[in-house]
Amino acid sequence: MYATLSSSQFLTMAGLMVVYILPPAGKETVIPIGIALGFPWWYMALSIAMIDVETGLFMTLNFDLAYKIPFLGPLLVDLTQKTERSIESHRWFAGLYFFAIMLFVMVPGLGSGGFRGAIAGRLLGMDTYPVLLAILAGALTGCFIIALGSAAVFSQLCINGLLPADISAIVCNRTL
């Protein structure tokens, strides 16, 4: 990213990424703000999706360490075992896990969707690669839907002159 942005744009983008990771801001907030600040919609979508995938990768690959945390580890082991028993009695439900994790990551919430999706996928007993693929698919789909929608709304607001003059000077003079 540093190679494709000026130093001030890079610092702004880094700030938006940090804000995305920390609640209460989510992708539904950060992507429109980035677009309003002049970043292309596709750049914002890819940047935020990258954060989801990176946090999902970290959590998925290191989730086994959570089983070793005192007090929390035994609770996670118990929850995972109950989930596995439930899956054995309802085998048809296991086929929906991929799409459930994808939807879980795609729908905006507090913080990174990759973090939540990785934990949910591993607690459901999914292997690492399907969890990562579901996170990737959900992050890209959700971020691109929000980015395209935000760019379309900003375009319509600018074309129709529905923004106040101060905000219009910032948002409408940028490339959408």
Predicted regions and their residues:
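Membrane-interfacial helix-loop-helix
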Residues: 1-16, 37-107, 128-130, 136, ...
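Transmembrane helix boundary and interhelical junction motifs in multipass membrane proteins
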Residues: 21-33, 108-119
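Generic detector of bulky aromatic hydrophobic side chains
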Residues: 26, 123, 172-173
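Alpha-helical transmembrane segments and, especially, the helix-loop junctions at the ends
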Residues: 27-31, 60, 114, 143-151
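Mid-bilayer segments of alpha-helical transmembrane spans in multi-pass integral membrane proteins
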Residues: 106-111, 140-144
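Hydrophobic alpha-helical transmembrane segments and immediately flanking/interface helices
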Residues: 110-137
